[in-house]
Amino acid sequence: MNNNKKTAAIVSLYGNSNFGNKLQNYAVQEILKKEGLNTVNIVNIPCLNNKKVNNIEVLKLYIKGWLRYILKGDKIKDCVDPKDPKERKKNFLEFNKKIANSKHFFSFSRLQEFDKYDYYFVGSDQIWNPIYGGLSDLDLLTFTQKKKIAISASFGIEEIPLDYKGRVEQYISKFDAISVREEAAKNIIEKICLKNKFVNNRFALSLKRLKIILRSN
C-alpha cells in the first residue's frame, strides 16, 4: 500500500456464496484504485447483533418474505449449488485474493478503530436489509464523519419498518452521495427527503461524478 495516497474503505456483503456482491466488491475496488486511492475492504465477521436492531421486526419481515413466495406461487430456489460444493468454495476463496487488503471486523465495541480512512463506500447488494443484519452501525457508517458514498445499495424490502425509520433518516441523510440498485430503495430514500443525494438510481457511479465527490473536500 502506498502510504502517500488517500485510502478508501469498502463495506460490503462478503459471503462466499454470491457472485453478484463479490464482483461488485471487486469492481468498486478497481475503480477506486484507478482513481489513485488505496483500498481497504472491511470484512464483517458474524458477531452479536447490534442492540439497536429490533429482532421482532426482523422476524416479521422474514415471515412476510416467505408468505410472499407462497402467495405468488414462486418456487424457492435450492441454495445448494449443483456443482461440487468444495470446488465452489475453492473458487470463491481463490477470487478473494483479488479483493486485497481486507480488515476483519469482529465487534461493534471496537468500531471506532475503523475511523481512520479518508473515504467510505457502502454496497452493493442488500447491505441495508434488516433481515441480514443491515442497518447496523457498520453498514450505516455511524462511527465516522468522513465522506460516505453508497454504491448500488439495496434494502431488499419495499418499506422500512417504523422502528427503523428514524435510524435510516438520521444516518443515511449524512451520506455525501447515494446510488441504489432498485426503484424500491430509491422510493424509501426519497421519502426521507434525500432526492439531492442521488447520483443515479441503478448502477455504480460514473468516474466523472466520482471524481467530483472525492475532490470536494
Question: Where do the model's predicted regions map?
Answer:
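Residues that mark the start of a beta-strand
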Residues: 6-7, 217
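Aromatic- and Gly/Pro-rich donor/ligand-binding loops
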Residues: 7-19, 23-170
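Terminal amphipathic helices with adjacent charged low-complexity linkers/tails
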Residues: 47-48, 197-200, 210
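Short, charged/polar "capping" segments at the starts of alpha-helices
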Residues: 49-51, 158-159, 185-189, 208
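Alpha-helix capping/helix-boundary segments
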Residues: 127, 184-185
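Acidic anion/phosphate-binding donor-loop and adjacent secondary structure
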Residues: 158-163, 205-217
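A short beta-strand/loop micro-motif in the catalytic core of glycosyltransferases
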Residues: 175-182
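Helix-loop-beta element that forms the nucleotide-linked donor phosphate-binding surface
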Residues: 186-205
